[in-house]
Regions:
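Active-site loop segments of alpha/beta catalytic cores
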Residues: 1-235
């Protein structure tokens, strides 16, 4: 990595933060092995898994080593500034383009290596149905965060990751198009089948009226308060 222009530019930004702020506080999104490999190989990555599996494994090996080394170097610099981080995150935004069998064969071994290199791991899936991959994710060590979409089997996911911080990625289309009754039903289901958890309302379109945002906040507060009261009430 030494001498690589992109890495040197990144380190220069880190040093600028240190000079301006002292502690280097922040979290780098390292994407994931499959996301980064796609940026390098493009759509050919997927047919390569059938016709050129050794090429795919070589790319994944290079990406994995680079991610782990980059995280370690950044964390060493942050620790020197007084900020200690020990976790890793992977953003498997493209995982739904793989069958669960191909994920298990090609990607899981490298996701596992990233997880094993750090104290805990968080896994981001966008708003996809994560059901085909949950059994494989459950084989990763020390999963501390997991998110997925509403079409997933939420009860099964909660059982697979009982101690992880769970999040539900709620789509901006649903935020904009669903009725208040439908939103209420969704959030009630999320709380009952997946909670305690976070709900992520990402990428909200500017055309969504403020009233809808207030409705979402009110719903989350009301359901959260009720769930907390039930959890703390004497049996």
């Amino acid at each position: 990595m030494d001498g690589n222009p992109c890495w040197e530019q990144f380190l220069n930004q880190v040093e600028w933060i240190a000079r301006a702020n002292g502690p280097v506080v922040g979290f780098m999104n390292w994407q994931s092995v499959v996301n980064n490999a796609y940026r390098l190989r493009g759509e050919e990555l997927f047919p390569d898994m059938i016709s050129e599996p050794d090429r795919v494994k070589h790319i994944f090996e290079c990406v994995t080593q680079t991610m782990i080394e980059g995280m370690r170097r950044l964390y060493e610099r942050q620790k020197a500034s007084g900020v200690e981080l020990t976790h890793a995150t992977i953003s498997n935004c493209l995982v739904n383009l793989l069958s669960p069998e191909m994920y298990e064969e090609f990607v899981l071994p490298y996701d596992r290596r990233v997880a094993e290199a750090f104290s805990m791991i968080g896994v981001h899936n966008c708003a996809w149905n994560a059901d085909p991959y949950v059994p494989h994710y459950a084989r990763l060590p020390d999963v501390a965060y997991m998110d997925m979409g509403l079409e997933s089997d939420l009860e099964r996911a909660r059982a697979a990751f009982p101690t992880a911080r769970r999040a539900l990625m709620y789509t901006p289309m649903d935020v904009k198009e669903k009725t208040l009754a439908q939103l209420t039903a969704d959030l009630e289901r999320i709380a009952g089948e997946y909670g305690p958890c976070d709900v992520v309302f990402a990428d909200i379109d500017r055309g969504v009226p403020d009233q809808r945002i207030h409705e979402l906040i009110d719903l989350c507060e009301r359901i959260s308060d009720r769930s907390a009261a039930v959890a703390t009430s004497p049996t």
